[in-house]
Amino acid sequence: MHALRTTPGLGRLAFLILLGCVACACGTSSAASSRSIVALGDSVPHGQNCSCTPYPELSAGGLSKSTGKSVKATNDSVSGYTSTNVLAQLKDNTNVIDHVRAADAIEIEIGANDVGYNKSCGTTVSCYTPHMPALKENLAAIVKRVKELTAGHKALVVLLDYWSVWLGGSYAKAHGDSYVAAAEEMTDQVDTAIKNAAKQSGSAYVDLRAAFKGPNYSYDETHYLSSDGDHPNAAGHQKIADATESVIEKRLGLG
């Protein structure tokens, strides 16, 4: 019996097809092992007044190290944004919509600017509380919209609150007792709204007030604040990232 001869051209073609299949398999494996985080919100996740890496990027880097998987962050937060602005982003901004659709975790920190301190209201809490119903509605709508955009795959919504929605630590104390009391009351209201939104929607919740001020909210958080007293410094962003990483890793099972 004569040995079967292989046509050189066919042999080369078969090799190229095999090589292509291997490349596709490798690409699929790489894509499957990578994860993505998208951050939405105001100047805190944006990293204002801190020449440092903001917490969304830090949390992605920390998760990459702890899990051995590639985790990348896209930071779509904008300084000055309110909950109304974030909701508009999720409805009208095609880039943000595409980012969220592909995300495995969406970090959202918003609400402080909805009740931002102003001279006309001063420390009169009742002057700010009329803004709370709209904030609560927007938080629910934001989470609902994110869940709609990520309906095709497993994704985790992470809601973060605030250590103070106004100035914090020694910066708040410098404005007097009435300012400190009003800041604490408004922070209570905003943080409660965020915590309830997380509970009602099944989202993850990160208690930054506890992270910065301890379990009883009694510690002075000044050492976590930048020079404006309103935003985190590098240590503050790392503290937020550590708290957020723990929640994401547990809820998504990235370990």
Task: Locate each region found by the language model.
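Catalytic His-Asp segment of secreted/periplasmic serine-dependent ester chemistry enzymes
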Residues: 163-255
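Secretory targeting and sorting signals
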Residues: 2-31
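Solvent-exposed loop/turn segments at secondary-structure junctions
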Residues: 43-46, 78-84, 111-117, 163-168, ...
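Short amphipathic alpha-helices and their capping/turn segments at secondary-structure boundaries
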Residues: 26-33, 86-104, 141-151
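Oxyanion-hole/transition-state-stabilizing segment in secreted/luminal serine hydrolases
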Residues: 88-133
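Sec-exported extracytoplasmic/periplasmic mature domains
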Residues: 60, 64-68, 91, 95, ...
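Serine-esterase "nucleophile elbow" of acetyl-processing enzymes
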Residues: 28-79
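Structural recognition of the beta-strand scaffold that forms the well-ordered cores
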Residues: 36-41, 45, 72-77, 104-109, ...
